[in-house]
Design a protein with these regions (language model features):
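Buried, small/hydrophobic-residue-enriched core segments of structured protein domains
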Residues: 2-34, 43-45, 81, 87-96, ...
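Hydrophobic residues within beta-strands of alpha/beta enzymes
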Residues: 200, 261, 289, 311-313
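Short amphipathic alpha-helical segments
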Residues: 55-58, 140, 432-436
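A residue-level signal for beta-strand positions that form part of recognition/binding surfaces
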Residues: 36-38, 96, 157, 331, ...
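Short coil/turn segments at secondary-structure boundaries
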Residues: 74-75, 143-147, 161, 452-459
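Residues that form generic nucleotide/phosphate-binding pockets
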Residues: 59-66, 76, 89, 134, ...
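N-terminal, Lys/Arg-enriched amphipathic/low-complexity engagement segments
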Residues: 35-91
């Protein structure tokens, strides 16, 4: 076996340009400059009213194991781009920075910091790729699962996507994110072992095909399993599948726990009604109807509108792949950097595309909730030294349409970004997965129904403090003036 497969180092799970930038910083003597980066996404996924943050546990594990291994260094040496002195620098690399982040299960919104990294320029740069890779995927899947949960009501939702996921890691961590977002169990046995997620499963069409007969297959399954859910659509749902499931259930009686039947094809609304009728007429009124087959929140919503008699939803491909929007688009931007005098100077990216203009400065996100009922008034992005939690009233306004504003009184301001690492040491205790799921449910409950609609939700307020807003405008003007002067000087030099 190639020795590389025995090396579980994730340090090179990065883009080449991160290493190249580290080399540039190192050679020009700025690698130890202090810097602050913030990760955020620009648009909510699936046209949803919120997103559910997920991925922090894996970020923590990644940071705690962030070391260049011998095989990492040997590989980089083999590329022939890097001098030995730089490779020695990498070999001695340790993450000594600080990370603040939303906790898993937190509701998050567009254009607000989700993760904030403070440290040397080099170490902040190195972790960008892995951090975005983790947050982009897991937050996307958790949000998709929440949408499924929203339309499913109290019906059990099972995650069935492992075979359709984009490789092993996506299946495992996608399952975890789906559980946080709202799924009740998974078919993925490894995820059950790793994370304590309840596991659930029935059987495949191949079992029925192997016995060439619904009855023989169901009987064989019942002889080896007490809990039985029979897949009834291999040949003919109403003429063979369900009648033979009923036959086996009656023959075995109390020897098995006949949980119900699963439908994986056909007109789910029509078939579920007919199947329900057959089960009820046979006396199995408590038997459940399980449905699978490329389901998602839109299909479930429509099936419920059509009066489908489905009790349990098995969600696979369209959840684990985030089928209708397979990318979140989270970005990682430098917001402050140390100047030659050791002073932190705010910085930003400007663009002719308004949505790509970043907000400079080290910031905190505050969730503003009413004391009267605990409902959220919106999120308030402020510079780090601002303390809205110490104010009696708070003026909130839309960062683009400033005439949309309000003054909030009798409120609580809760900081969203929590300390995870301080000077390279973890200071945050990772909660149990069930605690994360319960926390997410609490946050959903605090959100107004208007923001939870699957179709055309109201836009949740994400406002800037006056100080943050003013600084952003001042920075834009300052950068544009600096660019203008330098471009004029460059034009003069080129004209010589």
């Amino acid at each position: 076996m190639n020795s590389i497969y025995k090396d579980d180092s994730l340090t090179l799970h990065t883009d080449l340009y991160q290493i190249n930038m580290m080399k540039t910083y190192w050679e020009t003597g700025v690698s130890e400059k202090k810097a602050i980066f913030e990760a955020y996404f620009r648009k909510l996924p699936f046209e949803n009213g919120y997103a559910i943050f997920a991925g922090l546990e894996r970020i923590v594990r990644y940071i705690e194991q962030l070391r260049f291994s011998k095989t990492d260094i040997d590989y980089l040496r083999g590329l022939g781009h890097y001098p030995e002195e730089f490779l020695t620098y990498l070999e001695n690399f340790e993450f000594k920075g600080s990370i603040r982040s939303a906790v898993e299960g937190e509701l998050v919104f567009a254009n607000e910091p989700l993760v904030q990294v403070e440290g040397t320029l080099a170490e902040c740069q190195l972790i960008e790729t892995a951090l975005l890779n983790i947050v982009n995927f897991q937050t996307l899947i958790a949000t998709k699962a929440s949408r499924v949960r929203m339309v499913s009501g109290n019906d059990p939702v099972l995650e069935f996507g492992t075979r359709r996921a984009q490789e092993l890691d996506a299946a495992i961590w996608g399952t975890r994110a789906a559980y946080i977002g709202g799924c009740d169990a998974t078919s993925n046995v490894r995820a059950g072992k790793m994370f304590g997620i309840p596991v659930s499963g029935t059987h495949a069409h191949s079992l029925v095909q192997a016995y060439r007969d619904d009855y023989e297959a169901f009987k064989a399954y019942a002889e080896s399993h007490r809990d039985c859910v029979f897949l009834v659509d291999t040949y003919d749902i109403l003429k063979s599948g369900v009648p033979n499931a009923i036959r086996v259930a009656k023959e075995f009686g109390d020897k098995i726990n006949f949980l119900g039947v699963r439908i994986d094809s056909g007109d789910m609304a029509y078939m579920s009604k007919k199947v329900r009728q057959q089960l009820d007429e046979a006396g199995f009124t408590k038997a459940k109807i399980y449905a699978s087959s490329d389901l998602d929140e839109k299909t479930i919503l429509n099936l419920k509108m059509q009066g489908a008699k489905i009790d349990v939803w098995g969600i696979g491909t369209r959840l684990i792949t985030a089928y209708d929007q397979p990318a979140l688009g989270c970005v990682y931007k430098l917001v402050s950097i140390e100047d030659e005098n050791g002073v932190m100077v705010d910085t930003m990216k400007i663009s002719n595309n308004a949505e790509k203009v970043s907000t400079p400065g080290k910031k905190q996100v505050w969730r503003i909730t009413r004391n009267s009922d605990g409902k959220s008034e919106g999120d308030y992005i402020a510079l780090w030294d601002e303390r809205p939690d110490q104010l009696d009233e708070l003026f909130m306004f839309h960062p683009v349409y400033t005439y949309i504003n309000k003054t909030v009184k009798d409120f609580t301001a809760r900081p969203i970004l929590q300390k995870i690492f301080e000077n390279g040491k973890r200071v945050y205790e990772l909660p149990k997965l069930q605690e994360i799921k319960a926390y997410k449910d609490e946050q959903i409950e605090a959100l107004w129904d208007e923001y939870k609609r699957i179709l055309n939700p109201e836009q949740y307020p994400v406002d800037l403090s006056q100080k943050t807003y003013d600084q952003k405008l001042a920075s834009i003007a300052e950068i544009r003036e600096e660019v203008r002067l330098k471009s004029e000087q460059l034009a003069k030099e080129n004209a010589k």
